Amino acid sequence: MVDVSQHELVPEHTVLDEETLDGVLADYDIDRTELPKIKYKDPALPDNAEIGDVVEIVRDSRTTDEAVVYRLVIE
């Protein structure tokens, strides 16, 4: 079986710890439920991602060096 999360075109996905997440939510002045969603079964998610976690995705960008986005893991 192929592990798509290791493919060179799949951006880095990292599960945030609660302290980091609190800082991100405070910076954007939003609640966890207001974040864009990502399905639990998405093959790009790390193995330790669980429903309710927030994942930081760092990807290449044409306009900046990198773009950082956040997604809430849902069922």
From Swiss-Prot:
GO terms for molecular function: DNA binding; DNA-directed RNA polymerase activity. It is found in: Cytoplasm. GO terms for biological process: DNA-templated transcription. It is an enzyme of class 2 (transferase). Keywords: Cytoplasm, DNA-directed RNA polymerase, Nucleotidyltransferase, Transcription, Transferase. Its EC number is 2.7.7.6. It comes from the Archaea. InterPro entries: Arch_Rpo5/euc_Rpb5, RNA_pol_subH/Rpb5_C, RNA_pol_subH/Rpb5_CS, RPB5-like_sf. Part of the RNA polymerase complex. Belongs to the archaeal Rpo5/eukaryotic RPB5 RNA polymerase subunit family. DNA-dependent RNA polymerase (RNAP) catalyzes the transcription of DNA into RNA using the four ribonucleoside triphosphates as substrates. This is DNA-directed RNA polymerase subunit Rpo5. It comes from Halobacterium salinarum (strain ATCC 700922 / JCM 11081 / NRC-1) (Halobacterium halobium).
